[in-house]
């Protein structure tokens, strides 16, 4: 269908939007916006625009949704119409560099002259009066011209460096041109320098071997200042190391300073130890003697006597305060738990405790009363209560003995008194078994009484 120069193929949704089957969401949206602007009913007065606009909207809604688009693609594949209406999809992702070969205008770094040929003086045939263009838009063209000139200079200088040994003599008699004036001047200078050095080397045949080596090196490396940088080999390149060597340190002087410091520290430590021993000696002397009864009072000088006397008096007061201190007070306050011997600790399992355990083990657990032959309910209830009270008292006695047992303290010395501790533990286990037996009997009596009471 065609309306107002708009042709639409209504066979598929892809053909309605004019998009291939592999189109992206952006392409679908762009084509939808174009068609919507042209076919909108408000902008066109034809009758068929509303129907076409509905078709475009339906196509966009289905193709913009991934699930609906996948279902629609399956339907087209089954019908065999999936790739029939692609309308020449444009291949935008093309390799731009395909089929193009770029030539390298510049030489390698080792063959490039110093300054890249920009600062080389101009020849006589080149124009000296160059007027720069004032228009800023033409700066790129001027830069390109300078680049082309520099590349031509690189080519000429590289050719001269390859022919530095002068194999062809005919190259020296070439007519001057605009492109090779500078190259001829540089090559003539280089050849003249190399010839002079070779002549000096041939004339000095009877020299020492060291001088011969120096002359040979000069002959090999006979170059001009312009070609000196790129003719240098890798082995002869000047390279600064990443970590520069430090200046020579005076190690002996540093060690002597350290020794002096260590000796001072040792002297200070030795002085402190002597002072500490002197204080102890003075305290011992003041405990037995006093300052008034000492015979050495007249032998000590007056200045030293005042210092020693003040120290002795202060130390004597401190010693008088601490001399009456006794360790028995600590033992009396803390008790005998931490200051006891192992034998005293083993005697914690007293004989009375063992007797109580044995008495409880000898007592038999009373059998539960037979309440079935008693006809009256009150008699059954009284008999059951008496049994429970008696067993409760027995349980209290057993629990009291177990709670006050001293096996926990005796276990601290288990390595020496193993037999006594194990015997005591076995008796406690028997008491626990008896306690469980009493509990079972009480439970049976209570259950039977509850059944009979409830009927």
Swiss-Prot record:
Composition bias, Low complexity: 133-144
Top-level lineage group: Eukaryota
Matches recorded under Gene3D superfamilies: DnaJ domain (1.10.287.110)
Basic and acidic residues compositional bias, start-end: 156-168
Protein keywords: Chaperone, Cytoplasm, Nucleus
Primary location recorded for the protein, binned into one broad class: cytoplasm
Cell location: Cytoplasm; Nucleus
Region (Disordered): 104-241
Stored SMART domains: DnaJ (SM00271)
GO terms assigned for molecular function: Hsp70 protein binding
SUPFAM superfamilies: Chaperone J-domain (SSF46565)
Record's keyword annotation contains Nucleus: yes
PROSITE patterns: DNAJ_1, DNAJ_2
InterPro entries linked to this entry: DnaJ_domain (IPR001623), DnaJ_domain_CS (IPR018253), DnaJ_subfamily_B/C (IPR051100), J_dom_sf (IPR036869)
Assigned GO CC terms: endoplasmic reticulum membrane; nucleus
Domain J: start-end pairs: 12-76
GO annotation (BP), single: cellular response to misfolded protein
Protein's recorded name: J protein JJJ2
Provenance organism: Candida glabrata (strain ATCC 2001 / BCRC 20586 / JCM 3761 / NBRC 0622 / NRRL Y-65 / CBS 138) (Yeast)
Organism classification: Eukaryota, Fungi, Dikarya, Ascomycota, Saccharomycotina
